[in-house]
Amino acid sequence: MAQKIQSVKGMNDLLPVEQKDFKLTAAFWQAFEDTVGRWTRTYGYQQIRTPIVEQTGLFVRSIGEETDVVGKEMYTFSDSNDSLSLSLRPEGTASCLRAVVEHNLLYNSPQKLWYMGPMFRRERPQKGRYRQFHQVGIEALGFEGPDIDAEIIAMSADLWEKLGIREYLTLEINSLGNREERAAHRAALVEYLTRYEDKLDEDSKRRLKTNPLRVLDTKNPDLQEICNAAPRLVDYLGEASQNHYARFKAMLDGLGIQYIENPRLVRGLDYYNQTVFEWTTDKLGAQATVCGGGRYDGLIEELGGKPAPSIGFAMGIERLLFLVSEYGSLEVNAAPDVYAMHQGERADLQVMKYAQALRTQGFNVMQHSGYQSLKAQMKKADNSGARFALIVAQDELANGTVTLKDMNGAHGQQTVAAADLTNTLQQWKNA
């Protein structure tokens, strides 16, 4: 027997049934996707789909060459034909904005776009952190005021309500100011951290030289006292940045959205400025961040487009659905409405016709294939979770009748005219 080929470590199959180490099913996932589609439409967002492979330069330019994502985590390879460096996308914003610039989508109006799909990072796999993971992203492009900042946070809070997990999530916010303000803060931060360089761990020493703001994001408990006393970026904000942040907070207050100001919240990608935020939970262990985002007013220009102030966020689907599966609510209906079975050598064709007629009327029908006893077929109908069973027997063909059974018992088992099949099932379903 040939050796089995396993899936790549950290990349999961999505199956109709739960797995030992990955409890999410395809039906649960599909129910979430349906919810997201309805949710985004209510806010006027249109879907965009981009390739999972992009030129590596896109991420170097947008995310930042010195970030952990670009430096250590991307799957990068050369195209065999022209040695062009390509990468599997590690996040969705850069790809979305590349498409916007390439196709000139902002030529006459702002855009509200959303995406959903797989991302890839070479990380140590653990629950809630995978090498192939999935995100839903929201991008509001060409909007300058703090009102859109507040709106997209209200939008995310609305989704948490729909999923029944709002009480388990905490909103953290901060302002990173503009480029000049960050540069002034960076100089002060480097001077401060250099005094404690001998106490920093190796990762923080590397970040001190490449992206000192990320030192403040360390999870090392031995460095918390040093980081808490570090210069705060909020103290370097100019009047315009302060006003934007103050108006943003006032809008959250007016919407009744509670938040915590976290001056150490910096996000892991270099393109952010002004407003940044994260939704976190204490229900998922170390993987506390479920959703995060912020402003990236200079990114479209950095990618070759005309300047356009923008803001967005992304949520990790796996983490979010783990939270929903344990604490929230999501209506999942993977079972068929009807399980159609047959007895007799000519009944199989007729049951196929009945099944097709029911599908045209909106019923989900699973049709039995093969020839088994009625008892065996009924067992499969029960295992399928179908609400109703349709039985077509050989002796019913001549008199134009069928047998219907309500698997929940409410209507029992009845023989009805084939012409009344659809109406009867509709009445039972709506009762």
Curated annotation (Swiss-Prot):
Its EC number is 6.1.1.21. It comes from the Bacteria. GO terms for molecular function: ATP binding; histidine-tRNA ligase activity. It is found in: Cytoplasm. Gene3D superfamilies: Anticodon-binding domain, Bira Bifunctional Protein, Domain 2. GO terms for cellular component: cytoplasm. Its main location: cytoplasm. Keywords: Aminoacyl-tRNA synthetase, ATP-binding, Cytoplasm, Ligase, Nucleotide-binding, Protein biosynthesis. It catalyses: tRNA(His) + L-histidine + ATP = L-histidyl-tRNA(His) + AMP + diphosphate + H(+). Belongs to the class-II aminoacyl-tRNA synthetase family. This is Histidine--tRNA ligase. It comes from Neisseria meningitidis serogroup C (strain 053442). The gene is hisS.
